[in-house]
């Protein structure tokens, strides 16, 4: 399969801009400097580079106007040559530099992921002069020239062995042009992807995206698999998990959480294409190296395929935009501006030595014994809630798959439906499938937030007299733990045929277990996962109660068994089956 050009052995890669000229490297091209970069990256154990032929340099079109409209698109004031490159609006000079770059990469045995429409980089838009101020993702004229560029570029370089994948471009959803209709991005990315496939059907198309929603929004997980062969995540601590120190559970597990969510919902392999510490106000160099080591091992264990650090070399000394705009970092390379290695380099070398001892340099898939059902994406679910559910499961010695509730419900011994906050969380057909699986022996856990499910009395064995908005903290007493949970609603129980497992401080029942056919339904009237998703220190502080006792109850009921466990809440395990016997 052509995906195996990238997805196979676990890889460690890096996002590359030249050490001397960074984003300006194609204009101020210095092959000797690039070779010096390659030498130190090779010695550091890097095998994969993500590279960026800057759109504004490789297709440097200028619109030359007559009295009222564009008369022609030229190269500066000059006419485009009547050649394949010229007709595509592509700079022959830039392509020759790219050719030399690829030849050098081949010499050092680097594998290249090429970002094709690199119009967004480090929070700056790079567009050919002709298209400045245009809607880059939806203007028909712009897309026409993008297609010409892609077709010419891919056709010209498709025979270069070092290239193993075509990236749509760096975080292309951040380019202007989405407008009010999120489907504009689907049309744009599908159009670009189809053009790539026409010219080269031997390499995977990679999304290059940083962040995705579930179903709503322009670059959502549900449609990514229709456009691309491989999906990506860019999980930066300062944007998603900034409340916790880098080397703690939440920032580290955010990588496999995001990969699992992306892969399970999109249906295509998903890897960590960008991540980093983002500079030394966020951490020290030693902390950065410790973070990198933890992320490597965690990503390997959870089947994340590979990781690529942002970025190769420090850039904080550069004085042109966007670097002069950037006050959050830019000094986040593997190497400093003088090509001196940081402690992170030694961690990469040590990891690659360990990896070489594993047959095939990849672990067997880790076993999964539960499913997290994602409520319908109508604005009622957050990544914080899903991440908290994922982490509670890890603490309970469970590994989960993610499934979107409106889809066909797959078999699983345990279903986790966390913090329901939407009145349309699951369609009736899917819900009936789910309950049938419970009647046949599965375990279902539902925790309530503001959403309503009409069948709750029938499937939980409880009668709810009323609910009241209280916006207060309720403390659950369960398994020797006192577990405070912030809740918007209180549910007053009128009667119960279910087993009451826990009450709050007012002696109001809040946690129930009800036999349903051969299976069981657990119901919690409090939004445990939503609370922990935003609770400071929830997966960090030693004095935080052990909320995972709830999920351990679910694991025990569902018969989840592992060959090993650990009492420490932040030291977790994965289980990998080599064969039927081991």
Model-flagged regions — what are they?
Residues 183-187, 191, 198-281, 314, ...:
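Glycoside hydrolase catalytic-domain groove-lining segments
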Residues 343-414:
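Aromatic-Pro/Gly-enriched surface loop or interdomain linker
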Residues 423-582:
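A conserved amphipathic helix/loop scaffold
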Residues 310-369:
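Aromatic-rich peripheral "rim/lid" segments of glycoside hydrolase catalytic domains that contact
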Residues 2-228:
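Active-site mouth of glycoside hydrolases
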Residues 18, 170-182, 235-245, 255-294, ...:
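Active-site clefts of carbohydrate-active enzymes
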Residues 11-15, 48-53, 112-115, 164-168, ...:
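Structural recognition of the beta-strand scaffold that forms the well-ordered cores
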Residues 33-37, 148-154, 211-224, 250-261, ...:
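Alpha-helical scaffolding within the catalytic cores
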């Amino acid at each position: 399969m052509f995906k195996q050009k990238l997805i196979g052995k676990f890889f460690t890669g890096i996002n590359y801009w030249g050490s001397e000229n960074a984003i300006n490297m194609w204009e101020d091209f210095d092959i000797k400097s690039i070779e010096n970069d390659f030498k130190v990256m090779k010695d550091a154990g890097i095998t994969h580079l993500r590279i960026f032929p800057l759109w504004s340099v490789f297709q440097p079109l200028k619109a030359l106007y007559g009295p009222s409209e564009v008369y022609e698109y030229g190269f500066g004031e000059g006419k485009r040559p009547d050649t394949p490159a010229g007709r595509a609006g592509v700079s022959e000079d830039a392509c020759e530099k790219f050719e030399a770059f690829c030849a050098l990469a081949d010499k050092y045995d680097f594998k290249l992921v090429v970002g094709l429409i690199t119009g967004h980089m480090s929070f700056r838009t790079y567009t050919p002069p002709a298209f400045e101020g245009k809607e880059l993702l939806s203007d028909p004229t712009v897309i026409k020239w993008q297609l010409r560029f892609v077709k010419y570029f891919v056709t010209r370089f498709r025979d270069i062995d070092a290239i193993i994948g075509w990236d749509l471009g760096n975080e292309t959803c951040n380019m202007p042009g989405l407008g009010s209709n999120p489907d504009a991005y689907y049309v744009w990315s599908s159009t670009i992807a189809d053009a790539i496939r026409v010219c080269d059907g031997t390499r995977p198309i990679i999304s290059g995206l940083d962040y995705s929603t579930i179903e709503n929004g322009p670059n959502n997980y549900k449609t990514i698999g229709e456009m691309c062969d491989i999906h990506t995540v860019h999980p930066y601590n300062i944007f998603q998990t900034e409340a916790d120190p880098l080397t703690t559970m939440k920032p580290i597990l955010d990588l496999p959480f995001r990969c699992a969510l992306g892969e399970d919902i999109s249906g295509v392999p998903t890897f960590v294409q960008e991540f980093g510490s983002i500079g030394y106000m966020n951490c020290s160099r030693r902390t950065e190296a410790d973070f990198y080591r933890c992320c490597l091992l965690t990503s390997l264990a959870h089947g994340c395929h590979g990781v690529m650090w942002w970025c190769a070399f420090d850039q904080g000394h550069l004085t042109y935009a966007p670097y002069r705009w950037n006050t959050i970092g830019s000094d986040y390379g593997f190497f400093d501006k003088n090509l001196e290695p940081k402690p992170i380099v030694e961690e990469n070398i040590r990891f690659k030595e360990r990896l070489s001892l594993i047959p095939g340099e990849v672990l067997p898939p880790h076993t999964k014994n539960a499913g997290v059902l994602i409520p319908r994406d109508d604005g009622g679910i957050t990544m914080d809630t899903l991440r908290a559910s994922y982490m509670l499961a890890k603490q309970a010695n469970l590994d989960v798959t993610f499934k979107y509730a409106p889809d066909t419900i797959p078999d699983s011994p345990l279903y986790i439906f966390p913090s329901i906050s939407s009145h349309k969380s699951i369609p009736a057909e899917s819900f009936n499938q789910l309950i049938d699986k419970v009647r046949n022996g599965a375990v279902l856990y539902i925790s309530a937030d503001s959403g309503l499910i009409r069948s709750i009395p029938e499937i939980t064995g409880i009668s709810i007299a009323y609910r009241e908005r209280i916006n207060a903290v309720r403390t659950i007493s369960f398994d020797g733990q006192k577990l405070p949970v912030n809740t918007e609603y209180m549910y007053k129980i009128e009667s119960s045929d279910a087993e009451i497992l826990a009450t709050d401080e007012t002696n109001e029942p809040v946690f129930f277990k009800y036999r349903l056919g051969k299976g069981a339904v657990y119901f919690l009237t409090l939004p445990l996962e939503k609370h922990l998703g935003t609770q400071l220190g929830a997966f960090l502080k030693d004095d935080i109660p052990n909320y995972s006792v709830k999920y351990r109850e679910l694991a025990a009921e569902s018969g989840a068994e592992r060959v090993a466990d650990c009492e420490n809440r932040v030291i977790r395990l994965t289980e990998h089956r080599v064969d039927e016997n081991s």
